[in-house]
Amino acid sequence: DSMQVYRGMDIGTAKPTECERNRVSHHLFDLVNPDETYSVGRFVRESEEVIKKLKLRKKIPILVGGTGMYLRSLLFGLSQIPEVSSNIKLQVKKWQKEEGTPACWQKLKEVDPEGAEKLHPNDTSRIMRALEVVISSGQPISSFQHNDNSNAQRYPFYGMICDRPRQELYDRINQKTLEMMDQGWIDEVRKLLARYPENLKPFQSIGYREIIQFLRGELESSDLVPLIQQRTRQYAKRQLTWFRKENHLVWSHPDKKEQILKECMVC
């Protein structure tokens, strides 16, 4: 998961509990501080190291998460996206500074509607990256990502998507948000802000961004939880749209444990 690598961001990223970690070994958690950079390239390299070690111990690695690009890059290799000149990067940075991230998202929507649909209008770094690529190459970033998906699969793999009815999924999201609030999510954010500036990229993720707005007095307490729930549901919808285009994945309701286990054994 792209957010669970950050130390101190525990409740809001739904990291495994200490009890769960004691029952089975977990990897690639708490690798960097929120003010450090973590990339898909680093994820692939570190995942490959973990997989090698587990194979030597005759263990089968299980990957869990919802960051589609991370999974695709591990299975099929990193996207061969062309280099972007410093001039174009400066131009996009100027747009973002002068017009704001939502305006940049609108620009992206005009030239790469598919790519824009996958991103939240406030996801500054990914929006800027997508704009840089389309301006530099004349092609949307999604075209490079789709092309790379035709590469040979690098590992034998059985992939499953939890296929819940939409209302059941949304109900679980709403309940999970309430549980995370009860666990002290707001206090977690307060502690993070005591150590780090609020404009860091990880703090733009869903929930953290809204809690920061609440702590700044820009969001009423009565609006906080419903807004996080809404944006999480929207993100889940975008995730499902992404994964529907991944032909190597099987869709199954997680309650069908025997069927899932049987299919895994066949693979």
Which residues fall in each region the model found?
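Phosphate/pyrophosphate-binding catalytic cores of soluble transferases and nucleic-acid-acting enzymes
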Residues: 2-267
